[in-house]
């Protein structure tokens, strides 16, 4: 008897993708957005099937993602932002609520929401993860979205 294996691939050249993008820390987040769009295009997703939705910040992502999911127009939501630690507990609240909220929306809606939200200790770490030394986490979030759309279609 053979064990059946189900896995996603990156051949999802159809589907509609919402990029939920934070305006806060735009000097980093715009690079994440560019990396995500480039990845989607390289995998055959046309510009007509990519929509960019700007929210003020990562704390606002769960509600915006819920509204996007409720619209039932998207195969996946790619959340892109940067929460940079400062000297107060604000970072912990924003990063934690963003993460929990997006996960809850994803589970409730049965919709892939990929997490391209940087949660970093410094501006340097954010810059490294938005296209320099540590790659582009926006591109990685887009790849994950493609794979999840494919996987869900096979389950």
From Swiss-Prot:
Pathway assigned in UniProt: Cofactor biosynthesis; riboflavin biosynthesis; riboflavin from 2-hydroxy-3-oxobutyl phosphate and 5-amino-6-(D-ribitylamino)uracil: step 1/2
Pfam families registered for this protein in UniProt: DMRL_synthase (PF00885)
Top class in the EC scheme: transferase
GO BP annotations, alphabetical order: riboflavin biosynthetic process
EC number per UniProt: 2.5.1.78
Binding site for (2S)-2-hydroxy-3-oxobutyl phosphate: 87-88, 129
Annotated catalysed reactions: (2S)-2-hydroxy-3-oxobutyl phosphate + 5-amino-6-(D-ribitylamino)uracil = 6,7-dimethyl-8-(1-D-ribityl)lumazine + phosphate + 2 H2O + H(+)
GO molecular function, one term: 6,7-dimethyl-8-ribityllumazine synthase activity
Keyword check for Transferase: yes
Active site feature: 90 (proton donor)
Alphabetic keyword roster: Riboflavin biosynthesis, Transferase
GO cellular-component term (any): cytosol
Alphabetical list of InterPro entries matching this protein: LS, LS/RS, LS/RS_sf
Keyword Transferase: yes
List of residues binding 5-amino-6-(D-ribitylamino)uracil: 24, 58-60, 82-84, 115
Record's function text: Catalyzes the formation of 6,7-dimethyl-8-ribityllumazine by condensation of 5-amino-6-(D-ribitylamino)uracil with 3,4-dihydroxy-2-butanone 4-phosphate. This is the penultimate step in the biosynthesis of riboflavin.
Quaternary structure, from the entry: Forms an icosahedral capsid composed of 60 subunits, arranged as a dodecamer of pentamers.
UniProt family annotation: Belongs to the DMRL synthase family.
Protein name per UniProt: 6,7-dimethyl-8-ribityllumazine synthase
